[in-house]
Amino acid sequence: IDLIDVEDAKRGACLRAGFAASRGSQIIAMNADEWFAPQSLSKMVDIACDTAADIVFPTVSLDRYDAHRERHSRVLDAASIAIEDKSSMVTGLPQLILDGLVVQTSGVMYGRPLFEACLSHGKAYRTVEFMTYALLQAQRVSGCGDACFHAVAPKLTDVFDPTMYARVSDETRALDELADSLSEADSGGRLKLASQKFYFAGLVACIENLCLSPHGVSSIERSARMRDMLEAPRTRQMVAALKDNHRGLGLLFGPIASAKPARCVMCTHLAAFLNRTGAKTA
C-alpha cells in the first residue's frame, strides 16, 4: 500500500499528483479527516480480487458529533451491491442512488485503468458525474458490507450555501444522462424514478439550507430563491413524475407540488421541530 499525502490549493491538483505518484492496481482517494475502520482495506482488496470488480463500495458511516463529543452516525450499507451486466446495473443502480452511495465518491476503490480513464476524460472527482461515468465504464461493481469508511456528515444548516441548488441540478442531470444511456434495458423506468427521488431529496436539502441556516438573507431574497427553485422546470417535472408515488417523501412534497414558498418555509420549520423531538411524519 502506498499512502500518498498531497496538499495543493489548485482544484484537482492533489488528485492528479497523488495518482501520478501511486503504483497500486487499486486506487482510493479521500480527505485527511476521513478514515477506514480496521481491516477494511484488506477486505475491499479481497472483494476486488475475488469478483474482478472495477469498483468496490465500502459501507459508509456519515458521522457527526454532539456537544458531548458523542458520535451519531447514518450508515449507508453497501452489502447488497452486485453489478455484473446492464441488467443487474438497472436493478442495482436505483438502490445505489436512493441509499445515497452514488454521491460518496470518497473512499471508493477503483481499478487503476478505470480511475485513469475518468481523470483523462476530464471528470471532476467528488462529483456525481465522475461516479456515473465510472459506473458506465465498469465491467463489474461490488459492495463490501464488512468494510466501513467514516466521513463527516454534511452540515446542511450551519452555513447558507448559495451554490447548493446548482450543484443538485448538475448531479441530477448526470443521473438523468445515466438513465438515458440505459433506457433500453430499463423498460420499467426504475432509474428515471430513482433520479426523480434523488432530485426531490436534494431540493428538500436546499430548502432546509435556505430556511434554517443563519445567513442574513432578507425575507424578500429568501422568497425569491424559494420561488425560483419551486418553479424550475426540473422541479415541475419531478412533481409530475412523483405525484402518484410520493408516499414516504415527508411533509414538504405537498408545498413543493403546489409551489407555495410560504408553506414550504412553515413545513420546513415544522419538520425540523418534529425531527428534534423524535416524532415521525408520513
Please provide the spans of the model-predicted regions.
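Acidic donor-binding segment of Leloir-type glycosyltransferases
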Residues: 1-5
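Short aromatic/hydrophobic "clamp" motif used to bind/position activated sugar donors
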Residues: 27
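Glycine-rich, basic loop-to-helix element that forms the pyrophosphate-binding segment
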Residues: 6-22
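Donor-binding/catalytic cores of nucleotide-activated saccharide
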Residues: 11, 34-144, 152-164
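Amphipathic alpha-helical protein-interaction segments enriched in hydrophobic
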Residues: 189-208
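Active-site acidic Asp-centered loop
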Residues: 30-32
